UniProtKB/Swiss-Prot annotation:
Reported function: Specifically methylates the N7 position of guanine in position 527 of 16S rRNA.
Keyword line: Cytoplasm, Methyltransferase, rRNA processing, S-adenosyl-L-methionine, Transferase
Name of the molecule in the record: Ribosomal RNA small subunit methyltransferase G
Annotated organism of origin: Rhizobium leguminosarum bv. trifolii (strain WSM2304)
Record family assignment: Belongs to the methyltransferase superfamily. RNA methyltransferase RsmG family.
One GO MF term attached to the UniProt entry: rRNA (guanine-N7-)-methyltransferase activity
InterPro entries xrefs: rRNA_ssu_MeTfrase_G, SAM-dependent_MTases_sf
Sequence positions that bind S-adenosyl-L-methionine: 66, 71, 119-120, 135
Keyword Ribosomal protein recorded: no
Reaction equation(s) it catalyzes: guanosine(527) in 16S rRNA + S-adenosyl-L-methionine = N(7)-methylguanosine(527) in 16S rRNA + S-adenosyl-L-homocysteine
């Protein structure tokens, strides 16, 4: 099996397939993603989320903010299971979604845990991390504010944020409040979309 042109092991493929089946089951009763995207679950959500680990395939500690239906946090945790190292802390305040995330992690033997708390309170629970991820959560300025407890003054902590066609406007807005190093990774799944890799975050105002 390949995702975004990269080979995926049989074990990881089986975990992803089991996650997809669980997701479809739970999505009948919980609004995990926009219903219009369920028919394209593999490409729109699983392959898209896989890009984060494919960009940064290292066994680090992740904080996945506003995890929702598990994208990209559960997908990253599934890839880490193959490495048998690293961990994903999934932060989701909605208790029904948090229950789904716990079930998904347990049944796929993924390397992660769920914190059903507000993002603003999560740093005290999680501690330091090597990477932050978020998808469909907030604009870049908001994401940097959420990520600041982990990233400010931590040169080795990187943020990986999915963004759509308006990402340049979001970058311009964020530069009014923050300084940061930026790498733009073009999406292999969505035309005009990117994953923004942020490091060396500094607050201006």
């Amino acid at each position: 099996m390949e995702l975004n042109g990269l080979r995926v092991s049989r074990e990881t493929q089986e975990r992803l397939q089991h996650f997809a089946a669980l997701f479809q089951k739970w999505a009948k009763t919980i609004n995990l993603v926009a219903p219009s995207t369920l028919d394209d679950l593999w490409n729109r959500h699983i392959a898209d989320s896989s890009q984060v680990f494919q960009i940064h395939p290292k066994p680090v500690i992740w904080a996945d903010l506003g995890s929702g239906g598990g994208f990209p946090g559960v997908i990253t945790a599934i890839f880490l299971a193959e490495l048998q190292d690293g961990w994903v802390h999934l932060v989701e305040s909605n208790h029904k979604k948090a229950a789904f995330l716990r079930t998904a992690l347990r049944e796929t033997n993924a390397r992660g845990s769920v914190h059903s708390s507000r993002i603003e309170d999560a740093h005290a629970e999680i501690g330091e991390c090597g990477a932050i991820s978020a998808r469909a959560l907030a604009d870049l300025d908001g994401l940097l504010e959420y990520s600041a407890p982990w990233m400010l003054g931590e040169k080795d902590c990187r943020g990986f944020f999915h963004k759509g066609r308006d990402y340049l406007r979001e970058i311009d807005k964020a530069r009014g409040r923050w300084e940061f190093d930026l790498l733009e990774h073009s999406s292999a799944v969505e035309q005009e979309s990117v994953i923004l890799e942020i490091s060396n975050l500094r607050r201006l105002v």
